[in-house]
Amino acid sequence: MKVANGYEYTAIMEKIAPKKLAMEGDPIGLQVGDLSKKVRKVMFTLDVLEEVVDEAIEKRVDLIIAHHPFLYRPTQHIDTTTKQGKMIKKLIKHDITVFAAHTNLDIAQGGVNDILADLLHLQDTTMIEETYTEPYCKIAVYVPENELESVRLALVNNGAGQIGTNYTECTFHTTGIGSFKPGTDANPTIGEKETLTSIPEVKIEAIFPQYLTETITKAVKIAHPYEEPAIDVYTLETQTYKEGLGRVGTLPKKISMVSFIDKLKTAFAIDNVRFVGDLKANVQKVAIIGGDGNKFIHQAKATGADVFITGDVYYHTAHDLLAINLPTIDAGHNIEKVMKGYLKNKMEEQAKILDYEAEFIVSEVNTDPFQFC
């Protein structure tokens, strides 16, 4: 097994939550440290606080992957007598690197908002606000029948074959005869130089977002047995890869608002929420934006949702919600902590595929600043 460095782990993060999905001005990525350093232990956290850094030091963590960037606002100087300054000093002293995936993880398929929607058992989910589009591509690879599985895995393990949020590893296979004549300088896996060879082959096809072209073609070339594999990639005119903020979906059946709030508190492991609207209403269609969704209340209303879930609802926004008749549950910003276990599982899965040796843990520090008295 290989001890990978920080760059190799951030490459995995790029597959999970591509940087280009981030909202404009969001300071994602490296926060502090050295990504070239070998990584033997990774810790996932919602927030980077001094208590979290102390935990990382105690547990000998090399890389912290956070949801919220702690260098969110421009820093003109670092005063090591302040709480943040002390934290940065500790990170540098103990050679701990910090990396953040924020709105890109909120927006990505399978990211924060999908996790929250899944915990509520929402069905037929779609995005609330489209924020990114690009073309889909299709790849067609011609491979000997006995090598089909290795090439198929190279495709699906690198992002090809996903259709929507509920279908993965979608490929299409057709059989035929492949013919080729190796030149004098060739090193053919099958056949002889200067001799026409014809063998049964399988054409395997899958779609993928355009941004994954280089990653997928590189992986296929590594997995393919041929010296010069036949690979076709073309842009699809009829399909577009879309990503967006928030999710809206439906519950299996209509329930009362009070019952839904109880269900939500259990799903998100919280004791209290704030509510705006009519508690006597019924709920089936639900819109949710993890974190601060104040700017998107009209988009949430336009979905036809019976209730909107978000965090950090402002006083005047609450009046606006009453005015547009959109019942809203303020479940707090801290519900985004669900990303810790999700990223741990995804990283373990990818590290196993890549044969990386490391330990993955989630922070046990409660970073919610609020108490209810």
Swiss-Prot record:
**Entry binding sites for a divalent metal cation 2:** H68, H333, E336
Q: Which GO terms describe its cellular component?
A: cytoplasm
Q: Which InterPro entries match?
A: DUF34/NIF3, DUF34/NIF3_bac, DUF34/NIF3_sf, N-reg_PII/ATP_PRibTrfase_C
- Single annotated GO MF: metal ion binding
Keywords, ordered alphabetically:
Metal-binding
Query: Where do the annotations place a divalent metal cation 1 binding?
Result: H67, D106, E336
Please give the subunit comment from the record: Homohexamer.
NCBIfam families assigned to the protein according to its UniProt record, in alphabetical order: YbgI_SA1388
What the record says about family reads: Belongs to the GTP cyclohydrolase I type 2/NIF3 family.
Q: Could you tell me which PANTHER family the record lists for this protein?
A: GTP CYCLOHYDROLASE 1 TYPE 2 HOMOLOG, NGG1 INTERACTING FACTOR 3
Please report the name of this protein according to its UniProt entry.
GTP cyclohydrolase 1 type 2 homolog
